[in-house]
């Protein structure tokens, strides 16, 4: 019996992608960094989503063998849709990671992470040999916090030690 998952086949980005042309150019550049055998950490967000399409194109055209460690379920489902092999931080360490930033100031300080994938994105970045933070002109601000608040998160495990 053959079973098809229509959810994966019909997967698309949930919102309109702003600055799509700029993000696609950056996505092509990041995808161009992949080498055969690379284990690549993939953050979350629309630019990461577009970069996966560019990576999938290289995999198909060049018979490139890579593995992706996704930071979110959405990025994992995109990898499935595109036929990109996945692994986990439990099994492998990423050679490099790419992710987007939410805001970047004139001194190259940035806010990274406003969503549910924030903790795993941080784990990918810390465990990678190299990290590429993807930014288009829409992310440039004069002062951090101009567009979005800076989020804080806590891990519930050591909370009794912080009281």
Task: Give each language-model segment a name.
Residues 45, 111, 136:
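Residue-level signal for inorganic ion chemistry
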Residues 89-125:
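Glycine-rich phosphate-binding loop
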Residues 103-108, 140-151:
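Acidic/polar active-site rim loop that often engages polyanionic ligands
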